Amino acid sequence: MSNPSNDLTREELAAWLRLEMAPGVGNRTARQLLLAFGLPQNVFDASAHTLEQVVTPRQRSGLQSIPPQLPELLETTWRWLQSAPLRHRVLTLGDPAYPPSLLEMEDPPLLLYVRGPEWAWTQPA
């Protein structure tokens, strides 16, 4: 099921949240994984051997486990998105609307939770 204000499906949102929550995997490592595999779901579909070409065994283990808090966080985030479809949005690193200045950081956040009309956060301050 897709969210009208966001191009993310619920399944895609779950994968992004899971990557963000993976134990031992910070923003820098997550970005390396995204460069290597493309989308978060591809990271989770990768074999242990393939993952260990990019991350440590400890990080691989964290990526292969599903955080117990994920279902609740997914439900809360999805409800938030649905509550104001034209005013709430989750921007991922791969979203064309992700602020370019943040992409220049060494470890930009994987997800940005945006509230308000799009013009308010896309215009320079």
Question: Predicted regions span which residues?
Answer:
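Short, positively charged patches
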Residues: 1-125
